[in-house]
Curated annotation (Swiss-Prot):
GO molecular function, one term: DNA-binding transcription factor activity, RNA polymerase II-specific
Tree of life domain: Eukaryota
Pfam families linked: Forkhead (PF00250)
Biased composition range(s): Acidic residues: 15-39, 61-77
SMART domains: FH (SM00339)
Transcription regulation recorded as keyword: yes
Feature: compositional bias, Gly residues: 98-116
Name recorded for this polypeptide: Forkhead box protein D1
Subcellular location per the Swiss-Prot or TrEMBL entry: Nucleus
């Protein structure tokens, strides 16, 4: 009895161990099931519970899922410890541990995948503004000037964030170049082919960043307009009256109005004004000559005091001298041979100088003729009358002829007819000019009393004929 019971228990354990290994002999079990169906069972078989009996495999997806779920439920039931507290068989335990370890490994793999996905996106935007990026690009170039495409190329090569998002920020770089005064556009040279202008930094924007750090900008740079230096001194000089100083052509007054520009102060920052030899090389400020000092003073005085009288103009000689010295003018060697202006005394006296000037073919009156107006015509007529009076002519006051010799007197007067006609025409022209123009406009050379007396004498002589 005991031997049979022990053998039965051993056979039961063997059955359990064979059943616990699921999926190990699926092909063998399928073949056994087919043999059972065909032959109706040949030899003795181990008793298998009804729940463990495998059904014919169907090729539908739902049937396969149901079979797998039933097998997993059966495995859980077999692996569960009995109610009496007997220890579980040692076989399935390693499989369960391996499954748990595999699950842990899968979790670790999942965690590693999440960490890898987090480290896969390191694109962080740099903490620099577009102005700082452009400044970096320009400063690293050898000539301290770059085009828009070269600036974008530098930024893309230096920062991966902008390399990945390249087309989006190119317009921002363009707008910052155009709208900020710290960047100056330089056109291309005629012999330098290419597209786009160059951009450089304004020399006065060196202190734009704090201590050379591009993380923070100290202030917004604004380009100052070109104003005359020392404006306060110029205004005070204008208020005191700069007309006399400008009229005298004093170089000291001109230097006070327009002093030379002072040299730039030494830079106190450590990184220097962006290095040396970059940007626009502006020419030094040159003060204007003293010739323009009076004009500038008059314009500024009129702007400050619109109701005040203008300052007196500079003398003719001083202005001419200033013009010659300011513009490097030197008199031509033939200039001494040209006739100079007629002195006022000679014009009033009506001497030979005036007549020679009137008869000169190079004078303005001889070239233009009578188009200078009535004053010039009156002056020319007066000069001609003075020349006629200086020449020998019969006395205007003649003794009255005897009654018996009236015919002889008329014949004598008829002999001098052409000369008298010329004199009468000249005197008539002088009288007409004197009636239309005042004696001051005729330069004081024509006296109305003399003209009237001459007309009366000629009228009396004509009536005697």
């Amino acid at each position: 009895m005991t031997l049979s019971t022990e053998m039965s228990d051993a056979s039961g354990l063997a059955e359990e161990t064979d059943i616990d290994v699921v999926g190990e002999g699926e092909d063998e079990e399928d073949e056994e099931e087919e043999d059972d169906d065909e032959g109706g069972g040949g030899g003795p078989r181990l008793a298998v519970p009804a729940q463990r009996r495998r059904r014919r495999r169907s090729y539908a997806g739902e049937d396969e899922l149901e079979d797998l779920e039933e097998e997993e439920d059966d495995d859980d039931i077999l692996l569960a410890p009995p109610a009496g507290g007997s220890p579980a068989p040692p076989g399935p335990a390693p499989a369960a541990g391996a499954g748990a370890g595999g699950g842990g490994g899968g979790g670790g793999a999942g965690g590693g995948g999440s960490a890898g996905s987090g480290a896969k996106n390191p694109l962080v935007k740099p903490p620099y503004s577009y102005i700082a990026l452009i400044t970096m690009a320009i400063l690293q170039s050898p000539k301290k000037r770059l085009t828009l495409s070269e600036i974008c190329e530098f930024i893309s090569g230096r920062f991966p964030y902008y390399r990945e998002k390249f087309p989006a920020w190119q317009n921002s770089i363009r707008h910052n170049l155009s709208l900020n005064d710290c960047f100056v556009k330089i056109p291309r040279e005629p012999g330098n082919p290419g597209k786009g202008n160059y951009w450089t930094l304004d020399p006065e924007s060196a202190d734009m960043f704090d201590n050379g750090s591009f993380l923070r900008r100290r202030k917004r740079f604004k380009r100052q307009p070109l104003l005359p230096p020392n404006a306060a001194a110029a205004e005070s000089l204008l208020l005191r009256g700069a007309g006399a100083a400008g009229g005298a052509g004093d170089p000291a007054a001109a230097a006070a109005l327009f002093p030379p520009a002072p040299p730039p102060p030494p830079h106190a920052y450590g990184y220097g004004p962006y290095g040396c030899g970059y940007g626009l090389q502006l020419p030094p400020y040159a003060p204007p000559s003293a010739l323009f000092a009076a004009a500038a003073a008059a314009a500024a005085a009129a702007a400050f005091h619109p109701h005040s009288p203008p300052p007196p103009p500079p003398p003719h000689g001083a202005a001419a001298e200033l013009a010659r010295t300011a513009f490097g003018y030197r008199p031509h060697p033939l200039g001494a041979a040209l006739p100079g202006p007629l002195p006022a005394s000679a014009a009033k006296a009506g001497g030979p100088g005036a007549s020679a000037l009137a008869r000169s073919p190079f004078s303005i009156e001889s070239i233009i003729g009578g188009s200078l107006g009535p004053a010039a015509a009156a002056a020319a007529a007066a000069q001609a009358a003075a020349a006629a009076q200086a020449s020998p002519s019969p006395s205007p006051v003649a003794a009255p002829p005897a009654p018996g010799s009236s015919g002889g007197g008329c014949a004598a007067q008829a002999a001098v007819g052409p000369a008298a006609a010329l004199t009468r025409s000249l005197v008539a022209a002088a009288a007409a000019a004197a009636s239309s123009v005042s004696s001051s406009a005729a330069l004081g050379t024509l006296h109305q009393g003399t003209a009237l007396s001459s007309v009366e004498n000629f009228t009396a002589r004509i009536s005697n004929c």
